[in-house]
Amino acid sequence: MSVPPRDVIVIEACVLSLASNVKQPYYLQKAKDWLQNFGTLTLSAIHPSEDIRIDNNLHDDLNKQTSNTPVYFNQVAYLDFAQPIDYWQWLQLTKKFEQQQDRLLYQKPAVTLDVDIIAVKCLHQIDNIDQSLDEKGNRFVLFAKSENQWLGIRRRFPLACYDQVGIVDLSKNIDLSFIRNF
């Protein structure tokens, strides 16, 4: 079975979800140091998943902790790339970086570092984006049609509570209302 050709999606910024439940300060700092190599980085505060409470019960099932579930420490990052990069190349780089963080030394539910793309800001408008698929075969979420359109990674929505908290934190300095209101 052949893989369909992928559209070139050149991005100039992205929003990432970072998470760790093994030596959290160490691995989240490594993520920060690595991401800064690509451009201007803005980070939310770090939030332990057990400390996040929501009032509207929309995502309770996503955030329930059991006594056997290690507490994740979560952070949301906004990265404004110094040089535009192809989405697929960026995705490969983030997954390769994850694997280089001692992930093979631990078994789930222990995770040294997750780096997940939430949304990307495209350099140019993509006319056929409603037909484009991400690496899991899902269509992208189009937040707003504009010269620099933002696309969301569908499987990340609705946002988990820990990502919502990070987005709200980042929104104090960066307009991410299009994600918050989705």
Describe these PLM feature segments.
Residues 26-86:
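Short, surface-exposed acidic-centric catalytic microdomains
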Residues 1, 8-10:
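Charge-biased, low-complexity intrinsically disordered regions
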Residues 18-20, 77-83, 119-122:
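Short beta-strand-to-loop capping motifs
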Residues 3-4, 65:
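Short hydrophobic/aromatic-rich motifs at helix boundaries and adjacent loops
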